[in-house]
Amino acid sequence: MNNSHHRLIKSVSYLSVTTALIILIIKLYAWVVTSSQSILASLIDSMLDITSSFINLVALRFALQPPDHYHRFGHEKMQDLTIFSQSIFFFASAFFVGFASVKSLFIKTKPENISDGTIIMYLCMFLTIILVLYQTYVIKKTGSEIVKADKLHYFTDLLTNVIVIISINLSDYFWFVDPLFGVVISLYIFHSSYSLFKKAFKNLVDHELPEQDRQKIISIVNNHSGVKGMHEMKTRYAAQKAFIQCHLEMDGNISLYSAHKISDEIAFEILQKFPEAEIIIHQDPFGIEEHVNYREYIVR
């Protein structure tokens, strides 16, 4: 990741924290004046947004640092650890919001000062849209997983704002709409949390790349005439950075220079599919079966 990408990611992180803090204060006021359960749900969601944005900002100080003496693989996993932690916070918030909303269904309360609450929520939407548009631009330029996760939080917030506006305006006619929408928001938060949790957990435990990505690597190797077989292919992700290693089987009579050249050509092709990947290729003479734990395939 180059310096311009670093600057973009840092700038969007600062903007994210600032925007989240402003929205949090605005929604807190909206909840005080309306006593709306759906606004409370949205307020809790915003509290998590600012928490996650602050965590992201701190984590990025480490994740964007180049490899050092003690972390020679780099610091990308800090992003996965951050996203994993955020998902746990979101699970907890989804439970809290759902519990409060279900409780309100039995109490039969409805919001007050609906017009004030509506105006305030429109203001929150405007601020969120500006942030999401900038995050989309940064993701397009950098592909940052941590910014993608942050964008998901705020896109969720944008959707919940729409739901909140609808619910508080319908609550004049149907008292149960506001707490019911609070339950819907909590379920949405839970679903989003699970998606983040699943992806971050896979990266943290060094889960293999998706099968379609593995097949891309196999296809590249298979198309090179200098390779007769491949075994011990191991892959993993740390944030958006792929780590790929394998043993290539070649004619045992070719020179070391030729074997090295073939490996470089294959590594170059893989990098076209996986930019910024770290690739380790070991050359083996074809036909030697020692230390082969699993073979991906035999080319010829």
Curated annotation (Swiss-Prot):
User: A GO molecular-function term, please?
Assistant: zinc efflux antiporter activity
Coiled-coil intervals in this record?
none
Gene Ontology biological process terms in this record: intracellular zinc ion homeostasis
Output the SUPFAM superfamilies linked to this UniProt entry: Cation efflux protein cytoplasmic domain-like (SSF160240), Cation efflux protein transmembrane domain-like (SSF161111)
Q: Which residues cross the membrane?
A: 14-34, 39-59, 87-107, 119-139, 170-190
Q: Which UniProt keywords apply?
A: Cell membrane, Membrane, Transmembrane, Transmembrane helix, Transport
Membrane-related topology note: Multi-pass membrane protein
The yes or no answer to whether the keyword Metal-binding is present is no
Q: Which Gene3D superfamilies match?
A: Cation efflux protein transmembrane domain (1.20.1510.10), Cation efflux protein, cytoplasmic domain (3.30.70.1350)
| Subcellular location field | Cell membrane
Write out the GO cellular component annotations: plasma membrane
Family of this protein: Belongs to the cation diffusion facilitator (CDF) transporter (TC 2.A.4) family.
Q: Which PANTHER family match?
A: CATION-EFFLUX PUMP FIEF, MITOCHONDRIAL METAL TRANSPORTER 1-RELATED
NCBIfam families this protein is in?
CDF
Protein name according to UniProt: Protein p34
Organism expressing this protein natively: Rickettsia prowazekii (strain Madrid E)
